[in-house]
Each structure stands twice: as structure tokens, then as C-alpha cells.
């Protein structure tokens, strides 16, 4: 295919109609380099201002040289380029999260409203097949979306209808690690798909067809259920169990970054059926609120309320307090991080001691006053000790003692960790 053919496809689809500035995620591979060539050549026709963003993962000897070459490429094209270096323990998931966090920073800094990636049809096949093997919920088998709105930005994948073989051979960098089968996606690409294509030469087309069919069903159900108020439980429960599940799943599609597992979805169903009033965080900064025959799922407002020497910390929030950084459900990195098992079900209270405080230790209730005396804790330290409380019980006296019979929950929605780092040394 010729470059003008790709331009015509972009114009026909109207990918950039609503955008004046676009950030291109530039890895240096063939697909992203060719997308760079098309977008930079036809900026005027597409009416966009192009900005480049690259993440140096620091995993290969060639990484730094490739970064320098991309800087030269950007300078020759007279385009701005932003580069960030990945650090820490490498994993596919951590690297992906790092990239998208960085891309959003670049967009915020530049005022861009579109993020463009070079995902193509081969990536789509691999993604759908990976999710199928992992047992992902049906709606996620529709694969990567061509256009996806996340908050105030739109992710655009204009190559999703093309295969890698459609791209001309131009200057690019080869990542030799793609040939190694250490990572799951590489095993899919290098081993599983080629073997299955021996059984069915059109296996890739079959996978893409399934993904498109699931997407059609998903969109049709959303359209047909548009006038059903799923948040009205009386209305929801008037349908069969099967229809309830489909309607609830369609409702959850409104929250693309929620991503409940099958077990978590089943628990939400159970809560809606069994609890008259309920409120608790569920996942990724969302909470479920139920009041009799109504419910809603919404984002938890980031906040930490401080009243009368007491701080209330909500799930998936962080706060610095009296020389410590407290992180509720968000891991901290470092050698001296304390970890306390807690629950997502309710907020954590951090305070100083009160008269009558009791800690459960080894199955016995012990007054803090007596505990401090037994441990020979100085008066000054007693008064400054931070008490961590949840469900009305003391979970821990920071640096002194922990309730080893703190509430234990049975499901993966409710279990989490409070991470604590001393920041005032």
C-alpha cells in the first residue's frame, strides 16, 4: 500500500477531526516509525500539530543509541519530542502503565487531546487470543478499541485495520527481545499462532471476526438497553437472571478502567441482592453505593479529612501525616516500607491515643495504657504514637504493636494493604 492510501483511510475515518494537537507514541519499531512518516508528511492535510513521545525502557544495550537517533529524527522533522526513562523492576504491565502515565503527562504539558499509537491488526489478534487463554470476560474479547475516550483525552489507533505486512520496509529499530519467548505475548506471536495457522490458515481472520462480532453484540445490547434504568433495582430484578447479568455488565461498561474480575462481578451481584444499604470501595478508585432499591457506582473523591487530631484516609489515596507517608492500597517502593493488612471496605482512621483504647493481641484485649507500661514506652512516645483504626478497632500502633486478629475478609475485592514510609528522618 502507498502512503496516500493510509491518508485517505485516516480522512475517511475522521480520526483527527476533533483534535488540533496529537501525541504520537514512538517506540522506534516499524509500525510506529511508519505511522510517524505518514502523520509528519500529512500534518497539513490532517490539520494536526504533531508531538512525539518516547519511553526508553533501558532493557537493551541499543536503547540509548535508539533514543539519540529518535532525537535526531525529531530535530530533522522540526517536531518536539519528549523522552522518559523507565526505572525499577521490569514487567510488561509496569512498563505499559509507565508509558501511559508518561504520555498523559506530555499531553497535559502540551495541551494535546489525542494520543496516537501504532497498534495494528496483528496486535489485535494477539491481544484477543491472550485474553481468551486467560479466561477474560466476553466483552473484553472484542479486543483493542480503534478509538477510546479516557477522561479528557482520546486514544486513536489508526492502523488497527492493517496488518504489519501492509507497511513498507523503512528505517526502524528491531527489538531482538521480541524473538525471545520469555514474555506471554512473544509466545503467542512466535509459537502458538503459527502452530494454529497450520490447522487453519485463516485463524487470524477467525479471531478478528469473533472480536468484531462480540463488539457488535455489545453495541447492540447497549443501544437496546438505553431506556432501562439499571440503577433502579426494582426494574433490574424484573428481568431473568441471565438478562440481569448482561444489563449489569453493560452498565459497568461505562467505567472502562474498573475492570472487575468474574469473582468481583459475582460479589457485586450478591451485594445488590442481599444488602439493604451498603457503601464500600470496589476497585481502581470506584465505590459502590446502595440505598434500598437504588445503587450507583462512582469515583471516590480524593480526600483526606483531618478533624480534631484525627485523619480519615480513603481507599486508593495517599497522604503525608506527621512525618509519614500513608498509602491506602497503592504500593510504595523502598526497603523500609511497612505493610499492614487492612480492608478496602471502609476508610482508615489515623489518630493519637484516647482514654479506654484497647488492642487485641494474641486473642486477648489489652488496654493501651497497660501495654505501654509493659513495654516501657516513654510518656513522650505514648503521646505521639500514631493509632491506625478500622471498623472501630485498632489495627496497629505504628512501630509498637499490631492487632494480629484484625478483620480478615474472604474475597479479592476487600483485601488490601496500608503502606507506610517514614519521610521525616
From Swiss-Prot:
InterPro entries noted in UniProt: Lysidine-tRNA-synth_C, Rossmann-like_a/b/a_fold, TilS/TtcA_N, tRNA_Ile_lys_synt, tRNA_Ile_lys_synt_N
Catalytic reaction(s) noted: cytidine(34) in tRNA(Ile2) + L-lysine + ATP = lysidine(34) in tRNA(Ile2) + AMP + diphosphate + H(+)
Residues at which ATP binds: 27-32
EC id: 6.3.4.19
GO molecular function annotations of the record: ATP binding; tRNA(Ile)-lysidine synthase activity
Compartments reported by the entry: Cytoplasm
GO cellular component: cytoplasm
Gene Ontology annotations of biological process type: tRNA modification
Keywords noted in UniProt: ATP-binding, Cytoplasm, Ligase, Nucleotide-binding, tRNA processing
Domain of life: Bacteria
HAMAP family according to UniProt: tRNA_Ile_lys_synt
PANTHER family with a match to the protein in the record: TRNA(ILE)-LYSIDINE SYNTHASE-RELATED (PTHR43033:SF1)
Domain notes: The N-terminal region contains the highly conserved SGGXDS motif, predicted to be a P-loop motif involved in ATP binding.
Family under the similarity heading: Belongs to the tRNA(Ile)-lysidine synthase family.
Function of the protein: Ligates lysine onto the cytidine present at position 34 of the AUA codon-specific tRNA(Ile) that contains the anticodon CAU, in an ATP-dependent manner. Cytidine is converted to lysidine, thus changing the amino acid specificity of the tRNA from methionine to isoleucine.
Protein's name according to its UniProt entry: tRNA(Ile)-lysidine synthase
Amino acid at each position: 500500500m502507498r502512503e496516500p492510501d493510509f491518508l485517505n483511510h485516516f480522512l475517511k475515518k475522521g480520526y483527527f477531526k476533533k483534535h488540533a494537537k496529537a501525541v504520537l507514541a514512538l517506540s522506534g519499531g516499524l509500525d510506529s516509525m511508519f505511522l510517524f512518516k505518514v502523520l509528519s508528511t500529512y500534518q497539513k492535510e490532517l490539520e494536526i500539530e504533531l508531538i512525539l513521545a518516547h519511553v526508553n525502557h533501558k532493557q537493551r544495550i541499543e536503547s540509548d543509541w535508539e533514543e539519540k537517533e529518535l532525537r535526531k529524527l525529531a530535530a530533522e522533522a522540526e517536531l518536539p519530542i519528549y523522552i522518559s526513562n523507565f526505572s525499577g523492576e521490569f514487567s510488561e504491565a509496569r512498563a505499559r502503565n509507565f508509558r501511559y502515565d508518561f504520555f498523559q503527562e506530555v499531553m497535559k504539558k502540551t495541551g494535546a487531546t489525542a494520543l496516537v499509537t501504532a497498534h495494528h491488526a496483528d496486535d489485535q489478534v494477539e491481544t484477543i487470543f491472550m485474553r481468551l487463554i486467560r479466561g477474560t470476560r466476553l466483552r473484553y474479547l472484542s479486543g483493542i478499541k480503534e478509538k477510546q475516550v479516557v477522561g479528557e483525552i482520546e486514544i486513536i489507533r489508526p492502523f488497527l485495520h492493517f496488518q504489519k505486512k501492509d507497511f513498507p520496509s523503512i528505517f526502524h529499530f528491531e527489538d531482538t527481545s521480541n524473538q525471545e519467548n520469555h514474555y506471554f505475548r512473544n509466545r503467542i506471536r512466535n509459537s502458538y499462532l503459527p502452530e494454529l495457522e497450520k490447522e487453519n490458515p485463516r485463524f487470524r481472520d477467525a479471531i478478528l471476526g469473533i472480536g468484531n462480532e462480540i463488539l457488535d453484540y455489545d453495541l447492540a445490547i447497549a443501544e437496546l438497553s438505553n431506556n432501562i434504568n439499571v440503577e433502579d433495582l426494582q426494574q433490574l430484578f424484573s428481568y431473568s437472571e441471565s438478562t440481569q447479568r448482561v444489563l449489569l455488565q453493560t452498565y459497568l461498561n461505562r467505567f472502562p478502567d474498573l475492570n472487575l474480575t468474574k469473582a468481583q462481578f459475582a460479589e457485586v451481584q450478591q451485594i445488590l441482592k442481599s444488602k439493604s444499604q451498603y457503601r464500600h470501595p470496589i476497585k481502581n478508585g470506584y465505590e459502590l453505593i446502595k440505598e434500598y432499591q437504588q445503587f450507583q457506582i462512582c469515583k471516590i473523591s480524593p480526600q483526606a479529612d483531618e478533624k480534631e487530631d484525627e485523619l480519615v484516609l480513603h481507599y486508593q489515596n495517599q497522604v503525608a501525616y506527621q512525618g509519614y507517608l500513608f498509602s491506602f492500597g497503592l504500593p510504595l517502593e523502598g526497603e523500609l516500607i511497612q505493610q499492614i493488612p487492612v480492608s478496602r471496605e471502609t476508610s482508615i482512621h489515623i489518630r493519637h491515643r484516647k482514654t479506654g483504647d484497647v488492642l487485641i493481641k494474641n486473642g486477648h484485649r489489652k488496654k493501651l495504657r497497660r501495654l505501654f507500661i509493659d513495654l516501657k514506652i516513654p510518656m513522650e512516645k505514648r503521646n505521639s504514637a500514631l493509632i491506625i483504626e478500622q471498623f472501630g478497632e485498632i489495627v496497629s500502633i505504628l512501630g509498637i504493636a499490631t492487632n494480629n486478629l484484625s478483620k480478615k475478609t474472604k474475597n479479592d475485592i476487600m483485601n488490601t494493604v496500608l503502606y507506610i514510609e517514614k519521610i521525616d528522618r
